[in-house]
Amino acid sequence: MKKPLILLAMVVALMILPFFINHGGEFGGSDGEAESQIQVVAPDYQPWFQPLYEPASGEIESLLFTLQGSLGAAVIFYILGYARGRQRRDDRV
């Protein structure tokens, strides 16, 4: 009974700790950080292509990113569940 509580406390600590370590810091995406570094290294750099769709706001962009991740997770876990069910069925025969 102690082990699950210790693991739960560790997970909660890992979730809360970043807020205290970087208090007042700004959270930004890796794309924006990469873009700023490219501008420092090569100010005359021109992108090879433009995005097919540019979301109207950051909230819509976050929504699309979340939907993409959720769909990917659903596909992966469906495949894992299907494979496990198939393996159990084959083990019974």
UniProtKB/Swiss-Prot annotation:
GO cellular component terms listed in the entry, alphabetical order: plasma membrane
Key words, A-Z: Cell inner membrane, Cell membrane, Cobalamin biosynthesis, Cobalt, Cobalt transport, Ion transport, Membrane, Transmembrane, Transmembrane helix, Transport
Transmembrane segments: 5-25, 63-83
Membrane topology listed for this record: Multi-pass membrane protein
Known function: Part of the energy-coupling factor (ECF) transporter complex CbiMNOQ involved in cobalt import.
GO molecular function: cobalt ion transmembrane transporter activity
Major localization listed first in the record, in broad terms: membrane
Name of this protein: Cobalt transport protein CbiN
Subunit field text: Forms an energy-coupling factor (ECF) transporter complex composed of an ATP-binding protein (A component, CbiO), a transmembrane protein (T component, CbiQ) and 2 possible substrate-capture proteins (S components, CbiM and CbiN) of unknown stoichimetry.
Top-level taxon of origin: Bacteria
Homology family: Belongs to the CbiN family.
PANTHER family, per database record: COBALT TRANSPORT PROTEIN CBIN
GO biological process entries: cobalamin biosynthetic process
Pathway the protein takes part in: Cofactor biosynthesis; adenosylcobalamin biosynthesis
